[in-house]
Swiss-Prot record:
Any GO molecular function: beta-lactamase activity
Coiled coil: none
Residue intervals passing through the bilayer: none
Note: The class C beta-lactamase family has a specific amino-acid numbering system known as SANC, for structural alignment-based numbering of class C beta-lactamases, or else the simpler name structural position. A multiple sequence alignment was used to derive a consensus sequence and then the consensus was numbered taking into account insertions and deletions. This allows use of identical numbers, e.g. for active site residues, despite differences in protein length.
Signal peptide feature range: 1-24
Name of the protein in question: Beta-lactamase
Family: Belongs to the class-C beta-lactamase family.
One of the record's GO cellular component terms: outer membrane-bounded periplasmic space
Catalytic activity, reaction form: a beta-lactam + H2O = a substituted beta-amino acid
Active site as annotated: S89 (acyl-ester intermediate), Y175 (proton acceptor)
Keyword annotations: Antibiotic resistance, Hydrolase, Periplasm, Signal
Function: This protein is a serine beta-lactamase with a substrate specificity for cephalosporins.
Length: 388
């Protein structure tokens, strides 16, 4: 049986048999929310063979936490809302906010050519590539991953210098760690801080994300979950630009706080004006591919969504393939009637975050197994639809 940090008497017949539209007509109790979450996720966990998952649901102005299974099978350590999970590409949402903060504070401009921040790139293929293109995977075909031969700064710049685009900038979206990773590194370059320290000082600490890290300190190692692949424990090893593209670890408690800040930036305390503007700007609609709008890190769909379209878009057969995009010039400001989301994975972890600002609901799902994105999106949609 999956371990849960909630009462096991959640499923009682009178609630479970109500149709979802009946539940949504009045404000739900915590027990009703828990029933919806458990009825959706318990079968998913079993079917996907997921050892552990930490879930946070934001509803009725507050978070509710649900913890399942094991963070460390061998040690018998259960998942809690303080368990650290690898976020994989959900990290890109932090990089997006950090990049927009650099823009707000004047150390980077999205419309600048990349070469203004990387004089190492003297090849003619770079002359029309802007920072915005790197941030939105539209530079012209940078690959999903850097090659294994890139192991240090010298080989990194050699790689980018010899890279040849397949398309003109701003025409095709090709999801790429090599693209947004370089963006993150260059966006903070003029701060004179490392990317990790910049993120700590200007994003993590102001948002009070005290259990969110790129490098997990020794004092927090006991909270770090093991990921599992083929039943074996695994953890990520960050390669070049890994910090910027997939390097953040966090808890469900911190991630729901991060989600709240992104869902309602106006609620941030006074004195955080530039960070507030950065968060809002990260949800700007810069490019459109089908029904999907590309922000900085975040991907958005106009609400209400076509769920099957969003679910299909999340699968690797679409998400990782080149897609023709339309540049939105000027970028469309953040739209509150949006499904704002991001998936993420490492070899042993699978993460998902989604929220609907207009509806003031959202969910974070952190698992220590990489399982298919469409399964995550379907489950989150089912839960959020039942909460409305």
């Amino acid at each position: 049986m999956m371990k849960k940090s909630i009462i096991n008497t959640l499923i009682f017949t009178s609630i479970a048999t109500f149709p979802l539209y009946t539940l949504a007509q009045t404000k739900l109790t915590e027990l009703q929310v828990a029933t919806i979450v458990n009825n959706t996720l318990t079968p998913l966990l079993e079917k996907q063979g997921i050892p552990g998952m930490a879930v946070a649901v934001f509803y009725d102005g507050k978070p509710q936490f649900f913890n399942y299974g094991m963070a460390d099978i061998k040690a018998g350590r259960p998942v809690t809302e303080n368990t650290l999970f690898e976020l994989g590409s959900v990290s890109k949402t932090f990089t997006g906010v950090a990049g927009e903060y650099a823009m707000q504070t004047g150390i980077m401009n999205l419309n600048d050519p990349v070469t203004e921040y990387a004089p190492e790139l003297t090849g003619s293929q770079w002359k029309d590539v802007k920072m915005l293109h790197l941030a939105t995977y539209t530079a012209g075909g940078l690959p999903l991953q850097l090659p294994d031969s890139v192991t240090d700064q010298k080989s990194l710049w050699q790689y980018y210098q010899q890279w040849q685009p397949q398309w003109a900038p701003g025409v095709m979206r090709n999801y790429s760690n090599a693209s947004i990773g370089l963006f993150g590194a260059l966006a903070v370059k003029r701060s004179q801080l490392t990317f990790e320290n910049y993120m700590k000082e200007y994003v993590f600490q102001p948002l009070k994300l005290d259990h969110t890290f790129i490098t997990i300190p020794e004092s927090m190692q006991s909270n770090y979950a093991w990921g599992y692949k083929d039943g074996q424990p695994v953890r990520v090893t960050l390669g070049m630009l890994g910090e910027e593209a997939y390097g953040v670890k966090s808890t469900s408690q911190d991630m729901v706080r991060f989600m709240q800040a992104n869902m309602d930036p106006e609620s941030l305390p006074a004195g955080n004006d530039k960070l507030k503007e950065a968060i809002i700007a990260s949800q700007s609609r810069y490019f459109q591919a089908g029904d999907m709008f590309q922000g900085l890190g975040w991907e958005m769909y106009s609400w209400p969504i076509n769920p099957q379209g969003v679910i299909a878009d999340s699968g690797n057969d679409i998400a990782l393939k080149p897609r023709k995009v339309e540049a939105l010039v000027p970028a469309q400001p953040a739209v509150r009637a949006s499904w704002v989301h991001k998936t993420g994975a490492t070899n042993g972890f699978g993460a998902y975050i989604v929220f609907i600002p207009e509806e003031k609901v959202g969910i974070v799902m952190l698992a220590n197994k990489n399982y298919p994105n469409p399964v995550r999106v379907q489950a989150a949609y089912d839960i959020l639809q039942a909460l409305r």
